[in-house]
Amino acid sequence: WVHENKVSIESQLDEYGAILFSDLPVENAEDFDLFVSAFKYDTFTYEESLSNAVRINKTDKVFTANEAPSEIEIFLHHEMAQTPMYPKNIFFFCKSASQYGGETPLCRSDYLYAELLKEDASLIAKFEKNGVIYNSIMSNGDELVSGQGRSWQKTLGVSSKEEVELKLKELGYTWNWLEGDNLSVTTRTLKAIKELRNGNKSFFNQVLAASLGWKKNSNNETSPVRFGNGEEICNSNLQMISSLAESLTLLRNWKDKDILLIDNHRVMHGRKPFSGEKNREVLVSLTA
């Protein structure tokens, strides 16, 4: 079915940025792996990424969505835009929808860029000129109570402090060791705006997720995200970006067996808190 419809699927993905598949005969991680494999895209493996969200692998290509506790909201973001390496497409599979909440909000970042340009062209110019830098706290061992709880050992694929410092130096990152061998890491400057294949631009970053949901470094109150020149992004601008993004956000309840394909270069996603007796289980596969 995918082979017969791939051209149409990709055409619609180019136009809309996301496609929802419903009622396909996909029941589990293995079926989902076969569905994703049918597209014949290059796999973007989670083990080799620099993401610091806790995930659990189900197959070589399939893993759980962020394992953060159900009461935590994961704010709008582009997958792994806080790192130099990020996937092109994201496949989500809802194996089991939650009883209440748990939606995956979607926001077109090319639309957001256009709205921000109209609202404050000088702010967009600062993002384009300076880019952004991110500061995150990596724990010594997985921290399951956080949306960014993957340990520095797993995030960077190392086992010792000497190895992690060498890896961070190669990446052009800076770092400070904290109490308990936790690690404060600051990225090199990364782009905040992405030029798309059609010539349009998207607000491609993790500014909202970092500013609204990440922990500050309690040692020096370093903000999780700043302009690349070190300047703080003022709260009024963050609130304006958040408000515009919310006005462009689509929210739909998951149904069991739904599959969602999104273009990670153009569409941000998140996760709403959830509750109820039915356990939410959403699986993910990334492609390059």
Predicted features, each with a name:
Residues 1, 14-15, 70-75, 85-288:
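Active-site environment of non-heme Fe oxygenases that use a 2-His-1-carboxylate facial triad
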Residues 1-8:
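N- or domain-start disorder-to-order transition segments that initiate the globular core
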Residues 9, 18-22, 258-262:
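Generic beta-sheet signal
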Residues 12-18, 25-28:
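Short, solvent-exposed loop/edge-beta patches enriched in aromatic
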Residues 26-41:
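Glycine-rich loop at the start of a catalytic domain that most often binds anionic cofactors/ligands
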Residues 40-52, 278-288:
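C-terminal end-helix/capping segment
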Residues 44-78:
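A gly/proline- and charged-residue-enriched helix-loop-helix capping module
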